[in-house]
Amino acid sequence: MPQLNPHQTFANYIEGESNKLSRSVGLSIAEHPNTNQFNPMFIYGPSGCGKTHLVNAIGVQTKQLYPQKRVLYISAHLFQVQFVNAVLKNATNDFIKFYQTIDMLIVDDVQTWASADKTQETFFHIFNHLFRNGKRIILASDRPHVELNEMSDRLITRFSCGIIAELEKPNVQLCVDILNAKIRRDGLKIPAEVTQFIAETANGSVRDLEGVINSLMAYSVVYNSDIDMRLAERVIKRAVKVDDTPLTVDDILEKVSNHFKVSVSAVSSKSRKRDLVVPRQVSMYLAQKYTKMPAARIGRLVGNRDHSTVIHSCTQVENRLKI
């Protein structure tokens, strides 16, 4: 059975503008798990923004304050594997009963349940039992609940009945703070200019930040050299996929408009002319795929459209690609 990571706590979860709300709500839940406020908590954000650390911190803090509580962290994938094994062993009822005894259930990466209808149905019943009995449910996903296209509507409704908290990629200043915390914790000596350089080139991924520091430590020991800009540049090239010019929705609109020989203003207009519908849909599809921006925000930037229009456009393009 998976366990909480005791090293991922609130003490080493560095706060910034991108995670302030989520961290505050998570800490409140850990300190007051017996209230039904903010239940369930649905956290979403791109890979590497700190979701797993945050949900672990909630669980660890809860166990420290309430040792008698049964707190379980599990990935959605492992939950699904366990469920399939239970079905094969004709032990589905035992599987469900076990999860119904949990006081705080933390499920990570729930987006992996897309199209897994039986898993969704089983979790729906577990969710209802826990919720009715005042138990805590915390869910993490790489996208908003409204963009879990192949999730059942009734489960989506359950996900949204508590609090929805977005975790954005950390900005440069938060990356610097995270790096400095790790540097102090590991007893390293790294010049401020190197720290700033890493923060600016690691694409806002906490995993990348930690990976770069670990690599710097290894290189420094193996080659018996100080950690300086030269070494940092060498490590960055190997450890991080550097994106010098992040793609924006404006970039995509410009490229798509040029390809289809129409103007950006026309693509972003309210016009429903056929020669504008396709470039508009392609723009939305590429924006969702390459900017990791929520559908609602993409819609606002492409003619002030709602998230359902963006999702429909992406589906249309995906269907064409399959032909």
Predicted regions and their residues:
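Short glycine-rich substrate-engagement loop in P-loop NTPases that contacts/grips substrate
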Residues: K63, Q68-M104, D117
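Conserved AAA+ ATPase "SRH/arginine-finger" region at the nucleotide-binding site
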Residues: E147-N149, G162-L174
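Terminal-proximal interaction/regulatory segments of ATP-powered molecular machines
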Residues: A266-I323
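C-terminal helical "lid" of AAA+/P-loop NTPase domains
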Residues: N180-R184, T195-T201, R207-V222, L231
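Walker A/P-loop nucleotide-binding motif
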Residues: N34-N56
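Short regulatory helix/loop adjacent to the ATP-binding pocket of P-loop NTPases
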Residues: V84-L88, H145-C161
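Dynamic helix-loop-helix/coil hinge segments at AAA+ ATPase domain boundaries and subdomain interfaces
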Residues: P2-L21
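Phosphate-binding P-loop
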Residues: P2, I29-F38
